[in-house]
């Protein structure tokens, strides 16, 4: 019978196959291979191990190694890559659990129980001694928090954490942006802010390709594709995909306004409204244009202003390719491609001098969720559905539009009163009633003999 070596029983994966395995399956693969080596080592057949070139049967002193020593040397030395194929070396870059020196060689968890300062053993174990020491320095097990904030009483484990916390009370901001001058209390906040100037957005959506500056913004955006709404209101059952919208909704039920101005006492339900109010008190506009000197409160407004100077036009028409610097300009341009042009309420059918909002463009992109139960036709607006349902019911609303006259003003009120037969203006002398005040005034002058105007 031929000698069985480790290469005869090892299972090798290609790069494509290894990428399809999840972390649990990879861990299972490592455990099975380690268990296989244990069985071969327990047979204590020198030919089996020497044939694979895996490990020496004797140490440097010439003494024969025990089974436990063989396994320990196998797991600690960089032998996984040579025994289990090239994929162990190639996959080590993609494996998120790799180490600096041993790419995919996962050592078995060495039992190094955590000990607190009192000597009480804890259940957590560490693979490396330095990780255990780092854990002890954090005082996680002893829960010793020696640094207390004098203002709010909050406790901290490290003095540096207390110093960062005190900046929130004092408003101290040491880290300043070189481009716009805005200051921050933490360097991580400054690094995130600097990306707004460079335009870097490292987090991209795989569904639509939209990029984001922060990871949580990408997470909230992905929920718009999946329809996930993990934040549900306990009172009305309404779901939200964003925690900020959920908190604002809860405040509406509670009627509370947590953001209160210290200067005037005015309270706000939304943090953004509160920030705008505080800027009005401070009178500061941190975003100033270097070319014309105009200042803005918000970075988005400042960025839109900069486009005027550099001629940037990011809003492009999908039909003709024409670009615009403002989204409102793009909406107005898109109406020229639409079949229907917005008209005023006048009876002559002339277009209004001031264009109305782009309802034609919005109606093309808006999701049609309102469905007619009679014919099944869908609409994007509830008002459009109500108007459509009147065709089935035969209902005719009492308004000025039913008589073909423009709505609004005194004439509109007269037309409505004429339809319903209402005549509120009554003459005290003859008892005649009128629906229009102007006609009533002319009738009163007929009794007095006065004329509204004289001819020369």
From Swiss-Prot:
GO terms for molecular function: DNA-binding transcription factor activity, RNA polymerase II-specific; RNA polymerase II transcription regulatory region sequence-specific DNA binding; zinc ion binding. Keywords: DNA-binding, Metal-binding, Nucleus, Repeat, Transcription, Transcription regulation, Zinc, Zinc-finger. It comes from the Eukaryota. It holds the Pfam family zf-C2H2_4. Residues 343-352 have a biased composition (Low complexity). Residues 93-125, 331-365, 386-406 are annotated as: Disordered. SUPFAM superfamilies: beta-beta-alpha zinc fingers, KRAB domain (Kruppel-associated box). A zinc finger (C2H2-type) spans 147-169, 175-197, 203-225, 231-253, 259-281, 287-309, 315-337, 370-392, 425-447. Residues 4-77 form the KRAB domain. It is found in: Nucleus. GO terms for cellular component: nucleus. Residues 93-114 have a biased composition (Basic and acidic residues). May be involved in transcriptional regulation. Belongs to the krueppel C2H2-type zinc-finger protein family. This is Zinc finger protein 556.
